[in-house]
Amino acid sequence: MIQKETNLVVADNSGAKKVRCIHVFGGTGRRYASLGDQIIVSVKAAVPGGIVKKKDVCRAVVVRCVKESRRKDGSYIRFDENAVVLLNAQGEPRGTRIFGPVARELRDRKFMKIVSLAPEVL
């Protein structure tokens, strides 16, 4: 469950290291985001010379979430950290590499580029 003011780790090589959620897409009253949901983030820490800089506002998709998520088969998936991948305006990843595992729910949400770049899909 990601909400406004949640701090997240960036799981790609776009240059950002830590971001903070400032908006959850999905209507006025939408409070929480889960695996595969898009959010707007503000970059809080970045590496020098990266694609994105500190204070940049970007779109992102949640790829790992600490709060467990129930699947259709009755199993649950949970991760050790909250992580996102930064997106451009077309919904494609800004980085060229993805670090760490990503959830299978991204395939259902049509984020095929992220799924293909990820080293492991759980």
Curated annotation (Swiss-Prot):
The keyword RNA-binding applies. The keyword Ribosomal protein applies. Keywords: Ribonucleoprotein, Ribosomal protein, RNA-binding, rRNA-binding. It comes from the Bacteria. Pfam families: Ribosomal_L14 (PF00238). Disulfide bonds: none annotated. GO terms for molecular function: large ribosomal subunit rRNA binding; structural constituent of ribosome. One of its GO terms (cellular component) is cytosolic large ribosomal subunit. GO terms for biological process: translation. Part of the 50S ribosomal subunit. Forms a cluster with proteins L3 and L19. In the 70S ribosome, L14 and L19 interact and together make contacts with the 16S rRNA in bridges B5 and B8. Belongs to the universal ribosomal protein uL14 family. Binds to 23S rRNA. Forms part of two intersubunit bridges in the 70S ribosome. This is Large ribosomal subunit protein uL14. It comes from Pelodictyon phaeoclathratiforme (strain DSM 5477 / BU-1).
